[in-house]
From Swiss-Prot:
UniProt gene name: ybeY
UniProt entry keywords in alphabetical sequence: Cytoplasm, Endonuclease, Hydrolase, Metal-binding, Nuclease, Ribosome biogenesis, rRNA processing, Zinc
GO CC terms, sorted: cytoplasm
EC number: 3.1.-.-
rRNA-binding keyword on record: no
UniProt record, GO biological process: rRNA processing
The organism of origin for this protein: Amoebophilus asiaticus (strain 5a2)
The name this protein goes by in its record: Endoribonuclease YbeY
GO molecular function, one term: RNA endonuclease activity
Length: 147
């Protein structure tokens, strides 16, 4: 069976993802390592304002956020969804945490993918597991210094 596609879109900002083929292969690899299959995945890179409106409309949260993930999958083994990422939040977070912008972006991207794979981050224990998985997939796939 051929690989399902991952699509990248931009809303309300100017942004270009470097090396989309490498990123796509990386995400496919992560999904396979989790014993799941990709059906369809859209990344939407956007502004704070665009994502804030989504946050209000769909989650009733009146806050800025770096990522919102929507799963459309019928089961947890078949991954289908959208991941919205605020480039402005990623940039601010990178400055706050004193890390490279691209490292923060790729971490946020894999964070969204992990949500689609069934990982949560509501409790401290879940957050620890999520961070551990993020680190494993960032390092194992040498994604940290990609740009």
């Amino acid at each position: 069976m051929p690989k399902a596609n991952i699509y990248y879109f931009v809303e309300d900002i100017q942004f270009k993802l470097p090396n989309p083929k490498i990123i796509t292969d990386w995400i496919h690899n992560v999904i396979q390592q989790e014993n799941c299959q990709l059906v369809n995945l859209n990344f939407i890179f956007c502004s704070d304002n665009f994502l804030h409106k989504k946050n209000l409309k769909y989650l009733q949260h009146d806050t800025l956020t770096d990522v919102i993930t929507f799963s459309y999958a019928e089961d947890q083994k078949n991954i289908e969804g959208e991941i919205y990422i605020s480039i402005e939040r990623v940039s601010d977070n990178a400055t706050t945490y004193q890390i490279d912008f691209w490292q923060e972006l790729y971490t946020v991207m894999i964070h969204g993918v992990l949500h689609l794979l069934g990982y949560n981050d509501e409790t401290l224990l879940e957050q620890e597991e999520m961070r551990k998985k993020e680190s494993i997939y960032m390092l194992a796939n040498r994604i940290v210094n990609l740009h």
